[in-house]
């Protein structure tokens, strides 16, 4: 084994409410009627091409999967994503663990995002009690019912919000 084995007894989960979160949902959530940011011609061409491919796929009854990283949620595009799903443009989603963490934290606490540099240095990065507890509780409960990660966590977020 390379390095030192982690002593799990030394990990002390901390209350999420005490974390200095860097963004609130109100600060980052992009309204559906917001004016799109200006982008260059090359990028706009890529967006147009992608939109055309999505339209063609859906017109032909094909599935469209969107695979995205945490920054989509972290930077406030949740309503846009929800709208694409609700209107049938996207049929499947895939993200990483950080994407689901931001989604859950915004829904539960109304804020998310921590300073990686500071919190890694203090050994507190990712040690937030409620985030770990409730996401894993949702996954366990959903797993018992035969649900996958996304369905189980989505049900938990939609039906068991703190507020």
Regions found by a protein language model. Give the residues of each.
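Metabolite-binding pocket within alpha/beta catalytic cores that recognizes anionic/polar moieties
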Residues: 2-40, 48-150
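Conserved small/polar residues in nucleotide/adenosyl-binding loops
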Residues: 162-163
């Amino acid at each position: 084994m390379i390095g030192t084995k982690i002593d799990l007894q030394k990990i002390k989960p901390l209350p999420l409410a005490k974390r200095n979160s860097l963004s609130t949902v109100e600060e980052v959530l992009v309204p559906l009627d917001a004016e799109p940011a200006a982008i260059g011609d090359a990028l706009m061409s890529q967006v147009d091409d992608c939109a055309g491919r999505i339209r063609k796929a859906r017109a032909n009854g094909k599935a469209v999967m969107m695979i995205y990283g945490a920054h989509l949620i972290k930077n406030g595009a949740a309503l846009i994503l929800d709208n694409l799903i609700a209107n049938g443009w996207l049929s499947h989603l895939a993200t990483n663990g950080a994407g689901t963490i931001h989604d859950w934290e915004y829904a539960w606490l109304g804020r998310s995002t921590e300073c990686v540099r500071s919190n890694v240095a203090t050994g507190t990065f990712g040690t937030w009690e409620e985030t770990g507890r409730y996401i894993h509780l949702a996954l366990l409960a959903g797993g018992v019912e035969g649900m996958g990660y996304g369905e189980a966590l989505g049900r938990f977020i939609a039906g068991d919000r703190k507020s």
